[in-house]
Every structure is written in structure tokens, then in C-alpha cells.
Amino acid sequence: MRQGIGTLSEKTVHAVMKNYYAPDTDMHEIPIENFVADIYTGQEIIEIQTRAFNKMRRKLDAFLPLYPVTIVYPIPHIKWLSWINEETGETSPKRKSPKTGNPYMAFIELYKIRPYLSNPNLHLKLALLDMEEYRLLNGWSRDKKKGSERYDRIPVKFAEE
């Protein structure tokens, strides 16, 4: 699996969102209560979470009694896919995905942190992003696309915030 580009092995979407919400890198990756906050402004914590909200529970237990916490959830709105051949390094021309993201896609992740949703210190930002996604041609189907591994996603535009 490819490692991320930035601090703590983060990938492009995470790094771009972090720099968008806090251009001052002194606010990035701040240790608080045995955890590392993506962004700490001095008054609030901002966590960029691209998936797996269930992994946030222990962090929320530590952060919410101390500070307001905003979870930013980037959702792919319009996505262009390109495929990377692992053997040759060749990248296919991009094509538009038939799926269009919307805020309702957050419900599955929000369900994983439902006990925290009524906490007045918890805030959510759903960021709809148009993005380019690169996938490896390493899946199990004949054309190697089904079950393939996502290599990276690159945001190209904020569709809605």
C-alpha cells in the first residue's frame, strides 16, 4: 500500500484539506491528551476524517471535554477516474464516474459516532469536492478493476461546503 505524502503518512485529500482550514503549519499535528490533533487553533480542534469515523471515538472521548471539535468530512462530488498499470506505470485517460456525491453519503459514517452527535462541542463540516482519483489495475476481475486499490485522490475544486 502506498504511503501518504505528508505528516503521519497522510494522503493528498487529507493534506489539502488541512492546509485549506489552517494554512499556518504551526497549528498542524498538535499532541493533545495522548492523541495528535490534525489542527489545533488554540480555541478549537479540527479533525479531517476521510473515512472510518469509528476510529475517532477514543479521540473524541479525549478532545470533547476540553475543546470544541469540528470533524471535516470530504465527500467526492464529481470524480474523474484514471487507472495506473503497476507493471508499466502507464496511466489511462481520465473518465467521469457515473456516481455523484451528496451530503447523504455522510450518514453511514455519522452512524458510527452517534453517541457523540448530541454533544454541543461537536461540529461537522461536509465538504463536497470535485476530484481526480487514481486507482491501480490490481483487482481480481478480468480487467483488473473490480477490487482494485485506490492509489490517491486529488481535489480539484470545492463544489460545496
Each language-model region and where it sits:
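Long, low-complexity, charged/polar intrinsically disordered regions in eukaryotic proteins
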Residues: S92-E161
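Glycine-rich, charge-decorated loop segments at or immediately adjacent to ligand/cofactor-binding or catalytic sites
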Residues: W80-T88
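Short, charged, amphipathic alpha-helix that recurs within catalytic cores of restriction-modification
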Residues: A52-P68, K99-R114
